[in-house]
């Protein structure tokens, strides 16, 4: 007896529908609010939370478009994970997050912050950003010319190169590594999914941009330095100002590792437990400060500030040879420093377990507007995200913040989804291999596919009246369809 590939594929399709339908049913049961309610209706009530049960969840859910049938699944699985966040870089959701009491966080800078500022969850992250070694030889000219830029969009400033730094700044000896400890459960953070710290214009920062735009209008912020400040600092300032009445602790973003924008260092939410002077490698190794290469010091430079090599004196050539050698050695140090940060970030591929998520108050753009299935091309702020929808999302965030978050009261959906993947991914992969094997579809292939799928369906199926001689292959499709109705 021969079987058609279409028939076997139907079995797999039904199995997937059963599995995803079961997951979607569970998500409704536990109130993931981002996709749960009809337009213009909030799921969050600060004083009267809805009771969502297996027998009434239909009142709180709506169909999700097929193209994004796995979007919420992938968003939850990628949350607080380094590589999955990079694979799905354009985030569209706000995850309520809690940083438990006693958690250590780090900041490298020249002074103790008093307002909003960045903290890193790993000291390698802060160390890499805070310790910028002075450059030697020809490399020092590149840095002074602003090759890497300091403008809002990364463009280097126009005009002549800046003067060399004053002597007391050459070693940057005032840089400090600060270690903070959470003095209480910081239970009002918003974690922005995707590669939300990426300074791009391709959507990674849409969740911050949307909040910033709505906040500007709601708070009537007409003169807050919008054109002079770096975009991410402007967003952070607005978000913290908006969130202050609600007790917002800050936002959490994904960089190489996870970073926290803490809204207020002066409150009783964190305590400074360590402050160490950061020592520059050249100071530690006893090397002199870099030679100042400028026209004032007698160096041949053209109108662009570049060295005129054929006009160098023998002494200048010797200085450059020596310092270029030091710079080459320091480049190895900087490479290892960057590698340490990458390794610290990669350690969280399986999750940043020092941060906990309360999935009950998840707010997402999924099913509010069209979200492209391609994780690299989707945008939260597309044509379908009307101003009214943006206001609705911010309204849901405000109501969630009024409640406060408690991850211990939330279903751990990431754990549940991980179990589904671990259990069923091998099954689906094996069935796919069987169906896509070379040669004609014959009884042996059909039997092998049935052997893998039969035991998945039967435990959740009722006997089918009138079915004789057991379940044949195509009878299994009917069996699974019945299971789907029962589920």
Curated annotation (Swiss-Prot):
Transmembrane segments: none annotated. Glycans are attached at residues 40, 68, 150, 220, 304, 367, 442, 448. N-glycosylated. The keyword Ribosomal protein does not apply. Residues 1-31 form the signal peptide. InterPro entries: YOR389W-like. It comes from the Eukaryota. Keywords: Glycoprotein, Signal. One of its GO terms (cellular component) is membrane. Residues 141-176 are annotated as: Disordered. This is Uncharacterized protein YPL277C. It comes from Saccharomyces cerevisiae (strain ATCC 204508 / S288c).
